[in-house]
Amino acid sequence: MASWVGTELSALNPLRTLWLALAAAFLLALLLQLAPAGLLPNCALFQDLIRYGKTKLSGPRRPAVCRAFDVPKRYFSHFYVVSVLWNGFLLWFLSRSLFLGAPFPNWLRALLRTLGSTQFRALEMESKASQMLVGELALSAFLVLVFLWVHSVRRLFECFYISVFSNAVMHVVQYCFGLVYYVLVGLTVLSQVPMDDKNVYMLGKNLLLPARWFHVLGMMMFLWSSAHQYECHVILSNLRRNKKGAIVHCQHRIPFGDWFEYVSSANYLAELMIYISMAVTFGFHNFTWWLVVAYVFFCQALSAFFNHKFYKSTFVSYPKHRKAFLPFLF
């Protein structure tokens, strides 16, 4: 069993390589924005690819050719439609496999192995300790996939019934990446389920037997972070509504309340905390998922940096104590 764990921790499979590359790319983009003005050339196309929504307004002048690739920001809802359908599809397959022993379809099993799924062998399952460890991993992946699906359902609901979208835009490349993103995240979660040559590890009726304290902590953190993100989106929505809830304008205002008292992009901070809660659910030591968290951190930090810059340049009375993304730090 030790050899399996060591291999699982050390291998740089395609999924880890991809998430590492994405995290490094957004870290580099963030560092370039933090560099002193004039030190690096200001490429309009690069800026157009890393900004969306209101932050495009505070960026460099956009060439006409860039506007040809604009997609309405309200199409964010498409990301969550894809996620609800795709990850619901994966959750159905996983539930049947874990509790009924039904095998994954051949195409899905082959895809997961190509991406770098977690493997175990029957000879490694002889001891009770080994069975418990594999059961913990299987339960962790199941819970995280449930969290991901619930998160997507909530965000889809918010896009339709809470958020008030202006005529802001995003680049078509960002739109295409967003469509693929949740497909990739779902496959990443599913690849963490222990598999042998034919099937995933079956929990059967012993659903709660491998449950551990970090499963409970991860669930509590997920619910807490999700509640804060929902509240932040309600606050942003109310900035464009009257007391009766009717939309009266699509202009930008300074948000107050909840985590907005500390950071400009409280909803982005909540997003990061949601992904950290999933890392906790994996037992803190899932290297693949920490790479996903690293990507989310640098991606959200970059967007938060642009948001903070926009607010400070637009509103003279903007609270000076607020940070961009991390309370009291950044």
Curated annotation (Swiss-Prot):
UniProt keywords, alphabetically: Endoplasmic reticulum, Lipid metabolism, Membrane, NADP, Oxidoreductase, Transmembrane, Transmembrane helix
Enzyme class name: oxidoreductase
InterPro entries: 3-oxo-5_a-steroid_4-DH_C, Dfg10/SRD5A3
Upper classification of the organism: Eukaryota, Metazoa, Chordata, Craniata, Vertebrata
Described function: Plays a key role in early steps of protein N-linked glycosylation by being involved in the conversion of polyprenol into dolichol. Acts as a polyprenal reductase that mediates the reduction of polyprenal into dolichal in a NADP-dependent mechanism. Dolichols are required for the synthesis of dolichol-linked monosaccharides and the oligosaccharide precursor used for N-glycosylation. Also able to convert testosterone (T) into 5-alpha-dihydrotestosterone (DHT).
Protein name listed in UniProt: Polyprenal reductase
Enzymatic reactions: a di-trans,poly-cis-dolichal + NADP(+) = a di-trans,poly-cis-polyprenal + NADPH + H(+); a 3-oxo-5alpha-steroid + NADP(+) = a 3-oxo-Delta(4)-steroid + NADPH + H(+); androst-4-ene-3,17-dione + NADPH + H(+) = 5alpha-androstan-3,17-dione + NADP(+); 17beta-hydroxy-5alpha-androstan-3-one + NADP(+) = testosterone + NADPH + H(+)
Record's signal peptide: none
Main location: endoplasmic reticulum
Lumenal side: 41-74, 154-168, 228-277
Entry GO MF terms: 3-oxo-5-alpha-steroid 4-dehydrogenase (NADP+) activity; oxidoreductase activity, acting on the CH-CH group of donors, NAD or NADP as acceptor; polyprenal reductase activity
Recorded topology in the membrane: Multi-pass membrane protein
Organism field: Mesocricetus auratus
Segments on the Cytoplasmic side according to the record's topology features: 1-19, 96-132, 190-206, 299-330
GO-annotated cellular components: endoplasmic reticulum; endoplasmic reticulum membrane
Coiled-coil regions, chain positions: none
Similarity-based family: Belongs to the steroid 5-alpha reductase family. Polyprenal reductase subfamily.
